[in-house]
Amino acid sequence: MRLLRVAAALGRGPFPRVPAVLGWQGKQADWKTRRWCSSGPVPNEKIRNIGISAHIDSGKTTLTERVLYYTGRIATMHEVKGKDGVGAVMDSMELERQRGITIQSAATYTMWKDININIIDTPGHVDFTIEVERALRVLDGAVLVLCAVGGVQCQTMTVSRQMKRYNVPFLTFINKLDRMGSNPSRALQQMRSKLNHNAAFVQIPIGLEGDFKGIIDLIEERAIYFDGDFGQIVRYDEIPAGLRAAAADHRQELIECVANSDEQLGELFLEEKIPSVSDLKRAIRRATLSRSFTPVFLGSALKNKGVQPLLDAVLEYLPNPSEVQNYAILNQNDSKEKTKILMNPQRDDSHPFVGLAFKLEAGRFGQLTYVRNYQGELKKGSTIYNTRTGKKVRVQRLVRMHADMMEDVEEVYAGDICALFGIDCASGDTFTNKDNSDLSMESIHVPEPVISIAMRPSNKNDLEKFSKGIGRFTREDPTFKVHFDPESKETIVSGMGELHLEIYAQRMEREYGCPCITGKPKVAFRETIVAPVPFDFTHKKQSGGAGQFGKVIGVLEPLPPEDYTKLEFSDETFGSNVPKQFVPAVEKGFLDACEKGPLSGHKLSGLRFVLQDGAHHMVDSNEISFIRAGEGALKQALANGTLCIIEPIMSVEVIAPNEFQGTVFAGINRRHGVITGQDGIEDYFTLYADVPLNNMFGYSTELRSCTEGKGEYTMEYCRYQPCSPSTQEELINKYLEATGQLPVKKGKAKN
């Protein structure tokens, strides 16, 4: 009766009778006996670890809600944005239910046709990209959700790149076929042209928009309808007469696409043999696992159509943990070379435990650490070691998560995703059960923040709550960074976008009772040089007794545009003019001096400091002497060189009705955007442009007003490039006024 207790806790009453065709046969109490930790370890073949990723508002959370309902995990379906006063199960944070967007990756597990499925529902908003990175790093397969109207959008391309980085096989689900203007064929064409995927339909729709009735399975050659109040009764029928020719054409196209990427099916195709259903399914599985083919499924999660066949496809075509190769890196102190060790996916204790902490969360249950187990067994009460810190910790409680609810388990094995309590660690740490292990899993790619704001508590008495909240948020999210500005005496928080930082300000008030005042957003401008500059600097200080002496000679070089965010140091000295023990001190001086540029006070970046020669004194030279010499050399080079200010450029995608095309183009041009492309379907157009982030503030309000609320846009960080002369002059004058080197113009409003 565990499930009834869970349902009661959710306030949703007992479960309805779910038909056997859904794959969850038997009585309600059967769930308890078929849980994850039933009797002994579940074999790898009966496990799938999947993520659901997509562009914002493509219907990821709605799809997950339907999956949980059809698999018997929840009793009642609820909608995103809490239209029914409840909100989706996977949106457990109050802010998520209010806004109707997913902010954190919610983890859950369920069961379909005797197969255990771990599901991570990820955010679609580009400001929360780190959550998607974390999810894909630890998953074996994924479902990429596309909107049938929007097709391949800005964040879809980002997610596709992330899947490629972590080599994640995936299926595609084109959602929202019931929406006006839905065009799955266009979405498929965009997958081929924009994402370079070898993709083909595995299903085609029976009707579109308001006439969407069901789907045709091209492999089994049959029509599928979804009857009942909630689409829970799956009914199979013959293909409608009017669609038989189209189904035959699409089936032939599917076979050709798969044959191009699978050798075995390719041979059958060349021999002009007709592949059987099982031949085709096996070929699709092989091609999907090798990422050479993407099967495309169709449906409407909101209208309860197409979800059960997608679940069948997850079992049929996505890999189990034993079919994915995961490597750990052996860090050897005496060698710069890193040895890769293949993890063993056997679900027993015959190999040492290795796990990766991929997400931290502090909620009402205390500190939670999400861990993916890559090898061996982890038991409740056992001792594990953090390979980064060398500290040992005891596993006091081991749980599986279902959104913000949890279920205690005694042990987990390779391939499982679980959560631990009371573990002190950082995101990306590796755990083993051997204290001398130097293993570490490959770290998760963390993008650099692009926007900063000043944040302080409204009430000075809330400083303790404020610091506690900031500490928790920085541990949870590596893209949320905090520093104290000694000049303005303000706490500056940095993140991936306005929404990202706004969410944290609201969480501070809701979760810690600490309302915050935020300043105007500040763009992460940087300063760099445009040409190499030589330097020859001597630092001397003599004030009685031992003095200071350090001389450095070399050149300061600009880095190529793709490395504008980096700082590099190169030691090209020969002999002992600059003793090797003082070279790190020169580097430290260079890096310290890069914290503030001479033009506008922003950080310096895109520089390479090449140390070629120098001199030292037997008595007076020490570490501090060469730190000062490194600082002085940089300042000397900057004084003699030509500097410029660089700014972040965003890739912007605007979608609006055709009647507002001229207005939208004019708005982007006014913000100094460079239009890179254009697309259109029916009454809507899509505009692609590169626009400076500094010019994008307030654009959402402008777009809403000039398109009567019908336009929408997304943007993501693209690159750094030199800003316009007018922007550079404005930033320099603002800095000179702030430092008192230039009188403030009369009548100018102070910020």
From Swiss-Prot:
Chain ranges of the tr-type G domain: 45-322
GO CC annotation: mitochondrion
Pathway linked to the protein: Protein biosynthesis; polypeptide chain elongation
One Pfam family named in its UniProt record: EFG_C
Leading EC class: hydrolase
SUPFAM superfamilies, sorted: EF-G C-terminal domain-like, P-loop containing nucleoside triphosphate hydrolases, Ribosomal protein S5 domain 2-like, Translation proteins
Residue numbers of Phosphoserine PTMs: S92
Transit peptide: 1-37
Modification N6-acetyllysine occurs at: K176
InterPro entries according to UniProt: EFG_II, EFG_III, EFG_III/V, EFG_IV, EFG_V, EFG_V-like, EFTu-like_2, G_TR_CS
Main location (coarse class): mitochondrion
Protein residues bound to GTP: 54-61, 121-125, 175-178
Keyword annotations from UniProtKB, A to Z: Acetylation, Elongation factor, GTP-binding, Hydrolase, Mitochondrion, Nucleotide-binding, Phosphoprotein, Protein biosynthesis, Transit peptide
Catalysed reaction equations from the record: GTP + H2O = GDP + phosphate + H(+)
EC number(s) on file: 3.6.5.-
GO biological process: mitochondrial translational elongation
GO molecular function, one term: GTP binding
Subcellular location: Mitochondrion
Family: Belongs to the TRAFAC class translation factor GTPase superfamily. Classic translation factor GTPase family. EF-G/EF-2 subfamily.
Function: Mitochondrial GTPase that catalyzes the GTP-dependent ribosomal translocation step during translation elongation. During this step, the ribosome changes from the pre-translocational (PRE) to the post-translocational (POST) state as the newly formed A-site-bound peptidyl-tRNA and P-site-bound deacylated tRNA move to the P and E sites, respectively. Catalyzes the coordinated movement of the two tRNA molecules, the mRNA and conformational changes in the ribosome. Does not mediate the disassembly of ribosomes from messenger RNA at the termination of mitochondrial protein biosynthesis.
Protein name, UniProt field: Elongation factor G, mitochondrial
